């Protein structure tokens, strides 16, 4: 019997990462979930990540703490206000203040290190270049560049015992398509959290970019969003 396939999966607790993890599970990977506590104001997503990992049967779930508040530069980790807008209001084409400097590079670097230790060649990340907020580290060319760097940077790749592959199953999907994919895989989106600036009780604000993208996706996919069923 051939050994079971294994994958490191970046799991934030949000809709995209939950769907990505469900896709990896459907492809019969043994799941090694990786979640970061980086000083984000929406720390409620950490508990969401814990619930998702348990529901999808992760073999291991590693939490890593990095205080990116020290660096600042983002509304998610600093004193800036998270932008709010009304339903139907256009999203700016500029990179928003919710961009966290080099976040995916930092996260993928930790994932790469853990994957090398575990001798796992595939890393799943739920980046999306269609319905997204303009983040530069969600683009296909960024992923291609990181993968090339990874295979120059680690001992296993240089020695030829492992070739790293960064898997991005959502990269070309709309938010509605992501939700349809997840529903087909029985993802419980009631476990997920997407809001950048949750209310004191942990419920979504309903006005940040992430809330708007999520609502729009569920509406276009033809499903009710459990995050807003009681808000």
Curated annotation (Swiss-Prot):
Work out whether the entry's keyword set contains Kinase. Answer: no
- Is Zinc among this UniProt entry's keywords? yes
Q: Where does Zn(2+) bind?
A: 195, 205, 208, 211
**What InterPro entries does the entry give?**
QueC (IPR018317), Rossmann-like_a/b/a_fold (IPR014729)
Q: Which UniProt keywords apply?
A: ATP-binding, Ligase, Metal-binding, Nucleotide-binding, Queuosine biosynthesis, Zinc
Note on how the cofactor is bound: Binds 1 zinc ion per subunit.
**Might you give the EC number(s) for this enzyme?**
6.3.4.20
Molecular-function GO term, any one: ATP binding
Q: Any idea which positions bind ATP?
A: 11-21
Which CDD domains does UniProt cross-reference here?
A: QueC-like (cd01995)
Q: Which reaction does it catalyse?
A: 7-carboxy-7-deazaguanine + NH4(+) + ATP = 7-cyano-7-deazaguanine + ADP + phosphate + H2O + H(+)
Question: Example GO biological process term?
Answer: queuosine biosynthetic process
Q: In which pathway does it act?
A: Purine metabolism; 7-cyano-7-deazaguanine biosynthesis
Q: What is the required cofactor set for this protein?
A: Zn(2+)
The protein's role, per its UniProt record: Catalyzes the ATP-dependent conversion of 7-carboxy-7-deazaguanine (CDG) to 7-cyano-7-deazaguanine (preQ(0)).
What protein family does this chain belong to?
Belongs to the QueC family.
**Protein name from the UniProt record:** 7-cyano-7-deazaguanine synthase
State the gene name recorded for this protein: queC
